[in-house]
């Protein structure tokens, strides 16, 4: 999906997303918070105290992650970058300062080398042509500090409910889902090290009493989503 396609859906992004995930019984905010909880845990384990640290939300769009980033990283600074100017305008109107919202051309990130402590992308790369992944992962790596980390969250194409949901989603029309192993290979080929996979999001709301098990199921390739976590 290009910038104009994202712009087209920007105003109704949340309502479309909510309708699309109705079978889960959850809201877009539930999934956004889920990801930020994972990021908090990973950062605490690998980087420790990141008070005053700088984080990059690659493909941050309308800013869905922002309130939950602020909840789990109250002393850190977040920059949301996206190709969709319209989405960024909505993010600014909703959340504004101290979060930064920055447009980029889809080619080169407008930041100096070693700017950020950590970068994350929440279900973004399946919208990007596979041939562009290496270049953009390289850009993310370039703007990370030498000790930087990256978390790439994606939909799991091995989960049939995920595939059905993506196929029915208007803004996923041109999506190409990525297997976890393939994404890890691309991340490591871009220069990141020690990339590891964890499968996530196993139980819909009617089965929420089972969610306490999810942290022990990261090895099982049937979660609705997964992340790859790597170091520069």
What are the roles of these predicted feature ranges?
Residues 1-21:
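N-terminal, positively charged/glycine-rich alpha-helical extensions of SAM-dependent methyltransferases
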Residues 32-51, 68:
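Conserved alpha-helix/loop element of class I SAM-dependent methyltransferases that forms part
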Residues 56, 62-108:
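Class I SAM-dependent methyltransferase SAM/SAH-binding core
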Residues 120:
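A conserved beta-strand element that flanks and buttresses the S-adenosyl-L-methionine
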Residues 134-146:
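A short glycine-rich, Lys/Arg-flanked "PGG" loop and its adjoining helix->strand segment in the class I
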Residues 147-154:
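Conserved beta-strand signature within the Rossmann-like core of class I S-adenosyl-L-methionine
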Residues 149, 185, 195-232:
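A C-terminal cap/extension of S-adenosyl-L-methionine-dependent methyltransferases
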Residues 166-182:
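Acceptor-substrate binding/catalytic loop of class I
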């Amino acid at each position: 999906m290009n910038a104009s396609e994202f712009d087209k859906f920007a105003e109704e992004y949340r309502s479309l997303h909510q309708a699309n995930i109705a079978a889960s019984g959850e809201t877009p905010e539930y999934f956004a918070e889920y990801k930020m909880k994972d990021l908090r845990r990973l950062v605490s384990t690998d980087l420790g105290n990141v008070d005053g640290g700088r984080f990059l939300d690659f493909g941050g769009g309308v800013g869905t992650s922002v309130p939950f980033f602020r909840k789990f990283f109250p002393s850190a600074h977040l920059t949301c970058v996206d190709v969709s100017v319209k989405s960024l305008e909505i993010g600014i109107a909703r959340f504004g300062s101290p979060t930064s919202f920055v447009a980029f051309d889809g080619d080169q990130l407008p930041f100096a080398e070693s700017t950020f402590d950590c970068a994350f992308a929440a279900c973004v790369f399946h919208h990007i042509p596979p041939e562009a992944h290496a270049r953009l992962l390289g850009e993310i790596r370039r703007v990370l500090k030498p000790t930087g980390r990256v978390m790439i969250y994606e939909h799991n194409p091995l989960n049939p409910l995920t595939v059905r949901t993506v196929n029915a989603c208007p803004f996923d029309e041109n999506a190409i889902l990525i297997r976890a192993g393939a994404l890890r290979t691309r991340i490591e080929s871009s220069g990141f090290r020690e990339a590891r996979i964890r499968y996530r999001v196993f139980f819909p709301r009617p089965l929420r009493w089972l969610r306490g098990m999810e942290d022990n199921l990261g090895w099982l390739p049937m979660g609705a989503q997964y992340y790859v976590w790597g170091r520069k």
